[in-house]
Amino acid sequence: MQGHVTDQQTRLSEALKRRAAEEGFNPVGIARIPGSPRLQLRTKALQRWLDHGHQADMAWMAAPRRRDPRLLLDGANSVLAVGLNYYVDAQPSPGSLKVARYGWGRDYHRVVDQRLRRIGRWLSEQRPDCGWRACVDATPLLDKAWAEEAGLGWIGKHSNLIHPERGSWMVIGHLLTTEPLNADPPARSLCGRCSACIDACPTHAIREPFVVDARRCLAFHTIENREDDLPENIRAALGSWVAGCDICQDVCPWNHRSLPQSNDPDMQPRPWLLNLHKEEIQTWDDSVWEQKLRGSALRRIKPWMWRRNAAAAQPDPTPTL
């Protein structure tokens, strides 16, 4: 009887991953709850990070439910982890301000959530009695740790997930389910002695490997800081970044390989984001902001914050011939 159940689990597990691939997710993997001992170490590391105040004003990071997926879905047994590539081989035009790549396309929260829900409905058709919950990064879940547990990649020293063939340019999501599924092997860290991301951070926000202090992070300050003015040390280091920051990913050797480009329509850049200028942003009012950022994750940055960030940013010099 046990063998029969295991065969059923295997077939369902493989079918579920194929269904996720049909939604454009790659890589995909499965982890069993409560996870391996390494997952428990990640949970303890989160508490140390919180104890040191590295979360800055992001109080939601301390949500107790983040420590146990079963607090998000009663009876949860398994986690389907998925990655969605957003890498497009494009660069901002000379003299323009920079926006983090994840924000170039459609709001990934909506994209990933909608696709996960379709997978969840498919799962309900296969197992009518099972429960499930779609989770994107707004959900209190140790999302990168569970993605690592499911074999999608390892957490790099810059705290982003790295896949050996796809680099770190991917957003992730999870489908919690009460269905017992077959787990994939956890990913193994391949950062070795590399310190490129630590060395490149202009504000030394990566305090030590795997520990990012949001209080020093350009991405945090351009997206989450609700103060009228940015701190002086952030203004001095901002450079041309106006929404997020990709420096630690740009220098990562795993992103210097020949990476597959996303042909997903939802991940393609809005052209104006690659030709964004200081003077233009400083004239934005609410209506312009609404028109430009409809359906974008960058709506997290309110109009006055765009103007504040643009005032502090300095475009890279235009190359001369």
Swiss-Prot record:
Protein keywords: 4Fe-4S, Cytoplasm, Iron, Iron-sulfur, Metal-binding, Oxidoreductase, Queuosine biosynthesis, tRNA processing
An example Gene Ontology biological process: tRNA modification
Pathway assignment: tRNA modification; tRNA-queuosine biosynthesis
GO annotations of cellular component type: cytoplasm
Binding site for [4Fe-4S] cluster 2: 201, 217, 245, 248
Residue ranges annotated for the 4Fe-4S ferredoxin-type domain, each copy included: 179-211
Active site: 137 (proton donor)
Catalytic activity reported: epoxyqueuosine(34) in tRNA + AH2 = queuosine(34) in tRNA + A + H2O
GO molecular function term, any single one: 4 iron, 4 sulfur cluster binding
Cofactor note (record): Binds 2 [4Fe-4S] clusters per monomer.
Cofactor needs: cob(II)alamin; [4Fe-4S] cluster
Amino acids binding [4Fe-4S] cluster 1: 191, 194, 197, 252
HAMAP family in the cross-refs: QueG
Name of this chain's protein: Epoxyqueuosine reductase
Organism: Synechococcus sp. (strain CC9605)
Gene responsible for this protein: queG
